[in-house]
A protein has these predicted regions:
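Intrinsically disordered, low-complexity acidic Ser/Thr-rich regulatory segments
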Residues: 1-67, 130-136
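Forkhead-associated
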Residues: 46-121
Length: 136
């Protein structure tokens, strides 16, 4: 007589499945995407997001670690999805995420706009390298 657990199976999932995967070439090779800390405890730090993908902003952890006590452990996510497809997403943070002074849940962001998390002010910078112009 079969045991009562014969119908149950265990499946082990690959730990890497939940991690965001970065796609090569998602941002044009001649474009650089950065986030600069403009105010707060980490003022002056710059993070390169040019590879594209998703970056977690968090207190002392994550892809963009900040030493701001008002920033949640997993506060927000910056998504670089392609040319001019940049988003900021609040990750159910305690103190909220603000884009240009307005509280947001998920919002597209442009170069030069300001993102506030806790007491830290971040600015997204998109630099497109100029190409030489042929002489006429």
């Amino acid at each position: 007589m079969p045991g009562r657990n014969d119908h149950m199976t265990t499946t082990r999932l690959d730990e890497n499945l939940h991690r965001p995967r970065l796609k090569e070439g998602i941002v044009p090779a001649d474009t650089r995407v950065y986030v600069r800390v403009m105010a707060g405890p980490d003022k002056g730090k710059v993070f390169d997001l040019s590879r594209g993908g998703s970056y977690v902003v968090g207190r002392r952890k994550g892809d963009i670690p900040l030493s701001d006590d008002k920033v949640s452990n997993r506060h927000a996510e910056l998504k670089i999805l392609g040319p001019e497809a940049y988003f900021v997403v609040d990750l159910a943070s305690t103190n909220g995420t603000f884009l240009n002074g307005r509280r947001i849940d998920r919002q597209q962001v442009q170069g030069g706009e300001e993102i506030r998390v806790g007491d830290s002010l971040l600015q997204l910078s998109v630099i497109e390298q100029s190409r030489p112009v042929s002489k006429a």
